[in-house]
Design a protein with these regions (language model features):
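Membrane-interface extramembranous regions
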Residues: 1-127
Length: 127
């Protein structure tokens, strides 16, 4: 889920950047190059944030930070959802809504995984 949403945000960054470079009329109508360049940067940073946190969450070298990393990934995901609805201004699209659904599922899965990791390991059965 996290890799999928990272890919979506990097894709949106590329599409937005290409629009700024190749479609000056559409860029002007959408708020100008500065505004769209800012959004492209946000998309890139969001995608990169997901990738970095996924690596940190599952790489054995960072195992001692797993709980903190999981909460950071949950916070990034929640912030992404809030930012989408705050900035989209009612102009919803299938990619955005589909990605928000994936992000909600990601949060649920991360919480479930965190609860599972907190449970003590079952003692082996000896006879």
């Amino acid at each position: 889920m996290a890799l999928a949403t990272a890919a979506v945000h990097i894709y949106l960054g590329v599409i937005t950047h290409v629009m700024v470079v190749t479609q000056p009329d559409a860029t002007a109508a959408a708020g100008g190059a500065a505004a769209l360049g800012f959004f492209a940067a946000l998309f890139y940073l969001d995608g990169l944030g997901y990738i970095v946190l996924i690596v940190a969450l599952y790489h054995p070298a960072f195992a001692r930070f797993r709980r903190l990393t999981r909460w950071a990934l949950i916070a990034l995901t929640a912030a992404t959802i809030v930012a989408y609805f705050a900035l989209i201004q009612g102009q919803y699209d299938a990619i955005g809504i589909g990605d928000k659904i994936a992000e909600v599922v990601l949060i649920v899965l991360l919480i479930m995984e965190g609860r599972r990791d907190r449970r003590p390991a079952e003692a082996p059965i000896t006879e």
